[in-house]
A protein has these predicted regions:
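Short, contiguous alpha-helical
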Residues: 10, 15-18, 25, 30-90, ...
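Core domains of carbohydrate- and sulfate-ester-processing enzymes
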Residues: 75-96, 190-199, 258-277, 348-363
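Acidic/His metal-coordination segments adjacent to aromatic residues that form catalytic metal sites
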Residues: 94-106, 278-279
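Short, polar loop/linker segments at the starts of domains and inter-domain junctions
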Residues: 104-105, 206-232, 371-381
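Short aromatic-cysteine micro-motif
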Residues: 107-118, 221-254, 271-318
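Flexible inter-domain linker/hinge segments
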Residues: 160, 164-201, 207
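Cytochrome P450 core scaffold surrounding the K-helix E-X-X-R motif
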Residues: 204-223, 244, 249-250, 256-257, ...
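Surface-exposed recognition segments
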Residues: 225-228, 255-260, 322-395
Length: 395
């Protein structure tokens, strides 16, 4: 969902903020606003404040926003709604480990800040046009909030607390995916693969800043540019991610550890979902797996992960390619495409090149606004708290 339309944007911004506030209320009701330190997550109150801060930083405070990607970042910004906002919520300057020690706003004040930030954003959006370069920043803050919304599910799962991810219904099936959130209650009797022929493949998004008006991609992240041509040799790839039946066979055969939130009960298995244990659906994709876990499985199964280009090609050319239930690890290290130029939010991609692995697809907790076949997610290879799985290619 990357359409340039002010009405669409306005509705999406309001809807997403509603989900963000509902998520915050879950943590508040569960008395989990000050959880134990976790290097991959943030305290919920800091998360909410950061989302509100990020929105006003790039919209209301950004006097250069009308220039879009040509904005001069050296120019001063307007003052924040909060005097302490930059000192509290600027993720580029506030060290992660210190966020647990900050004396932040009370929960009602956090909520008020989030509401005020949204209100001024919507007021400014009403004065924009559908093809204004400024819309880049509105889309940026929308997608940023969707990322943090998904992270709230990671946090709730790690805390084993009750949690309602109401936005799941809106993310059920992405427009350009094939049964992305398939009904895994249906028994899957086989594990299908498909062969993709050798070809030159264009990887990445079109540069919307230089295309003609009728052919513009309204938004993309800087790491998706510049579209490049890759030479792909023919390969065979699974049409679905590895499921629990397959992964548990690997665990039983090798003695490899069970993933987080999975336990064996006699001869069967259960999974913990937001603090509630329930029977494991073995037809569902295996999840909460690190890149390291996928490598161990591939050695055992005599297969490999797809490269990022192979995943991209298969997702866009194979009719029955299912994606969108779990983020899928690829072989590739997160690197810039040739000709990469950082967008105004320079901290988004550039600091992480060379240290993270690329994941493609989406998870069941990825909001519809973030679901896009070109989207490049990236995490360090040991992360298994995220909703990550994988599919395989034949050797």
């Amino acid at each position: 969902m990357r359409q340039v339309n002010i009405l669409t944007l306005s509705k999406a911004l309001q809807q997403l903020r509603g989900h963000t506030l509902s998520s915050f209320e879950c943590f508040l009701s569960a008395n989990k606003l000050t959880p134990p330190y976790h290097k991959g997550l943030n305290p919920p109150a800091w998360e909410l404040g950061h989302i509100a801060w990020f929105q006003e930083y790039w919209i209301a405070r950004n006097l250069q926003r009308s220039h879009g990607l040509a904005s001069d970042l050296s120019q001063p910004r307007k003052a924040s709604l909060l005097n302490e906002a930059d000192a509290w919520f600027d993720s580029a300057k506030v060290a992660h480990s210190t966020r647990w020690d900050l004396k932040l706003l009370t929960p009602p004040k956090c909520i008020e800040y989030a509401q005020e930030s949204l209100a001024q954003t919507l007021e400014l959006l009403r004065n924009e046009t559908d093809h204004s370069p400024a819309l880049y920043f509105y889309w940026l803050v929308l997608q940023h909030e969707a990322m943090h919304l998904e992270a709230s599910a990671y946090m709730a799962q790690s805390l084993s607390m009750p949690f309602k991810a109401l936005w799941q219904h809106e993310a059920a099936i992405a427009e350009n995916s094939q049964s992305t959130a398939s009904n895994f209650e249906q028994q899957r009797v086989d594990y299908r693969t498909a062969r993709v022929p050798s070809q030159n493949w264009k990887l990445g998004s079109r540069d919307f800043s230089s295309n003609s008006a009728h052919d513009k991609t309204p938004f993309c992240f800087d790491n998706e540019l510049i579209e490049k041509t890759c030479s792909i040799q023919d390969f065979e790839i699974s049409l679905q991610p590895v499921n629990w039946a397959q992964y548990i066979n690997f665990v039983i055969d090798t003695g490899y550890r069970l993933p987080n939130y999975i336990r064996q009960t006699g001869t069967d298995f259960e999974t913990e979902v937001f603090g509630s244990w329930q029977p494991l659906n073995k037809d569902a994709p295996a999840v909460h797996l690190s890149w390291t876990d996928t490598q161990a499985y591939c050695v055992w199964a005599k297969c490999r992960l797809p490269t990022e280009a192979e995943w991209d090609c298969a997702a866009k050319t194979l009719t029955d390619f299912e994606w969108g239930h779990v983020w899928e690890w690829t072989q590739d290290t997160f690197e810039p495409y040739e000709g990469f130029v950082a967008h105004p939010y320079t901290e988004y991609s550039e600091p992480w090149f060379g240290t993270h692995k690329v994941l493609r697809g989406a998870s069941q907790f990825t909001h519809a606004v973030l679901r896009d076949v070109n989207y490049r997610n990236f995490f360090t290879p040991e992360r298994d708290d995220i909703y990550s799985g994988f599919r395989t290619c034949a050797l």
